[in-house]
């Protein structure tokens, strides 16, 4: 029965359709997406089609928007293969093009192959371009910073007590509060405030994506420096990054529809997964060291604070260096929203934790994890989601939030340490002399 069915299906397919289905003659480097930056560009398409007569095939290029692309000419060269060279004039914007391979047989023409919906993005690198002034980092320095980050995360793992970890899992209220704040309240507030302040669609989406990002690596650093619950901070960071696998695509789709930008974005799930693994792996190694080699764990715990401060300063320096270009595009409304986003996260997290009468270290941690967002993950999503001409405008949001949240946390840390010092000196004076 199956053999007869297969023969019937073959009889229903004409030879021309069979050739078109199973044979591909045109070869282009990236048939889904082409990116251009120069006023004049060249695309080479290779054809492996051998016609009945030599030089009988030709390439036809159809443009969806002639204000973005214009075909100057198409030249053909034939050696072992046939190469079609398409010379184009480009203008900033986005469009689609279609390539058709035709064969002429006397007065008749026959379509051999067609490639449709080739996405083309054209942008210009101006003096405000991110790549105009690249940051040159020596490979040895980069490797040193990477090793410091891994060592720092491993040292944080050494500070985790399994008993505390089990307690947190049995009472997951702080994690739930952080998740609700990060993935529901913050994106909505980012969307609402961006509409109130009248930001462009690209900037509004940039703020929404920044607000829906999970807590960044700086959360448990400040939890340590502000005497919060470090174990809870690390657990919240891991949990929120895991939830982001679902919530970031959902929020991306929802708010892009509300902004009228549906169908434009691609959320890099692998980037989120790699971030999660980057947090989990060295932290897990630190937990193992804590219980297998407690003496070495004590040594690692001693370097947590100085190493964390060093990495924080390096991060602030790099953020300012990279963000200066983006900040030239920022206006007063963008700066205002960049200042408000972290404050809202801190306020929501701390208020919810206080309402449920959680201990003070837990309240601090929930507030920090709700306000310290992984803005650079939002930047990566924007760079992959937008055409380059719009990516710079949208990237203003995560850089502004990253720098504002870092400055606000540093200011809070200085105030906290300044208030704590008189209290310590007063306690020392009251202590009885032996």
From Swiss-Prot:
Ranges in the topological domain labelled Extracellular: 19-129, 194-195, 256-268, 328-331, 387-395
Residue intervals on the Cytoplasmic side: 151-172, 217-232, 290-306, 353-365, 417-434
InterPro entries, A to Z: BilAc:Na_symport/Acr3 (IPR002657), Bilac:Na_transpt (IPR004710), Na+/solute_symporter_sf (IPR038770)
Compartment(s): Membrane
Keyword Disulfide bond on entry: no
BP GO annotations: bile acid and bile salt transport
Entry membrane topology: Multi-pass membrane protein
Secretion signal span: 1-18
Any one of the GO CC terms: membrane
Gene Ontology molecular function terms on file: bile acid:sodium symporter activity
Keywords associated with the record: Glycoprotein, Ion transport, Membrane, Signal, Sodium, Sodium transport, Symport, Transmembrane, Transmembrane helix, Transport
Glycan attachment points: 73, 96
Keyword Membrane: yes
Transmembrane portions of the chain: 130-150, 173-193, 196-216, 233-255, 269-289, 307-327, 332-352, 366-386, 396-416
Membership in a protein family: Belongs to the bile acid:sodium symporter (BASS) (TC 2.A.28) family.
Stated name of the protein: Sodium/bile acid cotransporter 5
Organism encoding this protein: Rattus norvegicus
């Amino acid at each position: 029965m199956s053999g007869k069915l297969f023969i019937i299906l073959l009889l229903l397919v004409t030879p021309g359709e069979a050739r078109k289905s199973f044979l591909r003659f045109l070869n282009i480097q990236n048939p889904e997406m082409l990116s251009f930056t120069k006023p004049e560009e060249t695309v080479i398409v290779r054809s492996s089609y051998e016609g009945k007569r030599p030089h009988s095939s030709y390439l036809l290029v159809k443009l969806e928007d002639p204000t973005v692309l214009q075909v100057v000419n198409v030249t053909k060269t034939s050696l072992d293969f046939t190469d079609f060279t398409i010379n184009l004039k480009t203008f900033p914007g986005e469009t689609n093009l279609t390539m058709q391979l035709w064969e002429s047989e006397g007065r008749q023409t026959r379509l051999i192959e067609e490639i449709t919906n080739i996405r083309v993005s054209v942008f210009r690198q101006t003096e405000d371009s991110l790549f105009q002034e690249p940051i040159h980092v020596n490979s040895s320095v980069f490797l040193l910073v990477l090793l410091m980050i891994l060592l720092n995360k491993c040292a944080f793992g050494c500070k985790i007590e399994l008993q505390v970890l089990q307690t947190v899992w049995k009472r997951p209220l702080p994690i739930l509060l952080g998740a609700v704040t990060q993935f529901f309240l913050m994106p909505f507030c980012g969307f609402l405030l961006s509409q109130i302040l009248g930001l462009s669609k690209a900037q509004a989406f940039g703020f929404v994506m920044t607000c829906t990002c999970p807590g960044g690596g700086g959360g448990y650093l400040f939890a340590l420096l502000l005497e919060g619950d470090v174990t809870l901070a690390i657990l919240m960071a891991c949990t929120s990054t895991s939830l982001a696998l679902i919530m970031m695509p959902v929020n991306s789709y929802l708010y892009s529809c509300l902004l009228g930008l549906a169908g434009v974005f691609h959320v890099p799930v692998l980037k989120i997964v790699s971030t999660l693994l980057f947090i989990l792996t060295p932290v897990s190694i630190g937990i193992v060291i804590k219980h297998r080699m407690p003496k070495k764990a004590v040594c690692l715990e001693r370097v947590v604070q100085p190493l964390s401060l060093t990495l924080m300063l390096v991060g602030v320096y790099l953020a300012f260096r990279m963000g200066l270009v983006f900040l030239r595009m920022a206006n007063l409304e963008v700066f205002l929203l960049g200042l408000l986003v972290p404050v809202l996260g801190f306020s929501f997290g701390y208020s919810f934790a206080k309402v449920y009468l959680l201990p003070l270290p837990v309240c601090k941690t929930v507030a920090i994890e709700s306000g310290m967002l992984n803005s650079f993950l939002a930047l990566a999503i924007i760079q992959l989601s937008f055409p380059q001409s719009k990516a710079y405008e949208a990237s203003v949001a995560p850089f502004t939030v990253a720098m504002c949240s870092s400055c606000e946390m540093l200011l809070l840390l200085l105030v906290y340490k300044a208030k704590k010092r008189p209290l310590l000196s007063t306690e020392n004076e009251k202590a009885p002399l032996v």
